[in-house]
């Protein structure tokens, strides 16, 4: 039975009321712009939440909220790993998924610290984890095809992944969640992300490929060669963003892309983690450009090419910590900054409230 094509209807946020929102920000008891990037973040959040409220014509009266923030970590394996493009074998994906379920990974620690609910989704690791609670089964297969030899997956598998992702987001939306963050786990997924980046941005592979979690120079050369072979093999088939995912992507990247689109469709804020999640965002923006309005980019990772992708998406990340772990760790660490933007917008006094002469 074939999977029907999945489409998303994403409304752009309205910028018509930006002057009123900006005025509210500027009249807080501080010099204009003194809170730096927190101010532009508050403006973005106010655009999204005023558009989705009954006060779209009076956005300055909208009380900003972060409700039930949820971290979704998507896991999948990659056929290209058999060629030795990573320091770790594919089995580590499964072992780390178990670690997530048992609460022992960095993402677990950070989510507990900042107040994220964490869900782990098996999108297609080689061997499913059985008998362990807390892992959501949304498997599209047992690892992707090796992209230098064959497509990662069929085009209809992409739509199946999008449909699963939409259902996942709908469940959280119905529970009242209005902010979702995206992380991933998949040995070899920097290869898939770099291939996606090269295909969409029309860049040389060498400008997109990095050392992942720390490969040596010999392995890096092999990684470069295999991705170049993949792009050459699929050149004629790369006719659009979905075909890029089908030829070059990963099951976890497909479902991240679909979940970003579904969350934006529901006017939820979307926090994008590092290199892999940004590759998913890159595809999502190609499918539905309006999704960009809802994306908050958490950090610039230490992975080669991430800065280029962020610049292409006109994104200014909140953090730059030299992270190269993935899992959603950077997105988790960004949540307190997002909450700080909401809190100053809602709670700071204006000059008139405080009886202070304005410095605007």
From Swiss-Prot:
The keyword Transmembrane helix appears for this protein: no
Record EC number: 2.4.2.21
Keyword list, A-Z: Cobalamin biosynthesis, Glycosyltransferase, Transferase
GO molecular function: nicotinate-nucleotide-dimethylbenzimidazole phosphoribosyltransferase activity
InterPro entries: Nict_dMeBzImd_PRibTrfase, Nict_dMeBzImd_PRibTrfase_bact, Nict_dMeBzImd_PRibTrfase_N, Nict_dMeBzImd_PRibTrfase_sf
CDD domains for the chain: DMB-PRT_CobT (cd02439)
Statement: the UniProt record of this protein carries the keyword Glycosyltransferase: yes
Active site: 327 (proton acceptor)
Family named by the database record: Belongs to the CobT family.
Entry function: Catalyzes the synthesis of alpha-ribazole-5'-phosphate from nicotinate mononucleotide (NAMN) and 5,6-dimethylbenzimidazole (DMB).
The protein's name in its UniProt record: Nicotinate-nucleotide--dimethylbenzimidazole phosphoribosyltransferase
Species the sequence originates in: Shewanella baltica (strain OS185)
Underlying gene: cobT
């Amino acid at each position: 039975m074939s999977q029907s094509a999945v489409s998303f209807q994403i409304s752009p946020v309205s910028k018509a009321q930006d002057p009123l929102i900006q005025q509210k920000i500027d009249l807080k008891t501080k010099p204009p712009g003194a809170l730096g990037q927190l101010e532009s973040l508050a403006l973005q959040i106010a655009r999204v939440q005023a558009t989705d409220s009954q006060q779209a014509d009076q956005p300055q009266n909208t009380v900003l909220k972060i409700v039930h923030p949820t971290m979704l970590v998507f896991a999948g394996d990659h056929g290209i790993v058999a060629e030795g493009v990573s320091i770790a074998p594919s089995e580590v994906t499964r072992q780390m998924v178990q670690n997530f379920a048992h609460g022992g990974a960095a993402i677990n620690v950070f989510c507990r610290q900042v107040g994220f609910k964490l869900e782990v989704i098996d999108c297609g690791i080689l061997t499913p984890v059985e008998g362990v609670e807390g892992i959501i089964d949304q498997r599209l297969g047992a690892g992707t095809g090796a992209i230098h030899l064959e497509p990662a997956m069929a085009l209809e598998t992409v739509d199946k992944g999008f449909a699963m992702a939409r259902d996942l987001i709908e469940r959280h939306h119905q529970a009242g969640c209005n902010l979702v963050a995206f992380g991933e786990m998949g040995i070899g997924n920097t290869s898939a992300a770099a291939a996606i980046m090269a295909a969409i941005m029309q860049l040389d592979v060498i400008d997109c490929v990095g050392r992942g979690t720390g490969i040596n120079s010999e392995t890096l050369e092999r990684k470069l060669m295999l991705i170049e072979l993949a792009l050459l093999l699929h050149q004629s088939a790369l006719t659009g963003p979905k075909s890029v995912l089908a030829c070059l992507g990963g099951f976890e990247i497909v479902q991240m892309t679909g979940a970003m689109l579904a969350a934006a469709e529901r006017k939820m804020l979307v926090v994008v983690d590092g290199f892999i999640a940004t590759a998913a965002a890159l595809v999502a923006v190609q499918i539905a450009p309006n999704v960009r309005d809802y994306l908050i980019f958490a950090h610039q990772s230490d992975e080669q090419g991430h800065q280029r992708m962020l610049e292409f998406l006109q994104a200014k990340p909140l953090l730059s910590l030299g992270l190269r772990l993935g899992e959603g760790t950077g997105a988790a660490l960004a949540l307190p900054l997002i909450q700080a933007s909401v809190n100053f917008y809602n709670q700071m006094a204006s000059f008139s409230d405080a009886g202070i002469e304005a410095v605007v």
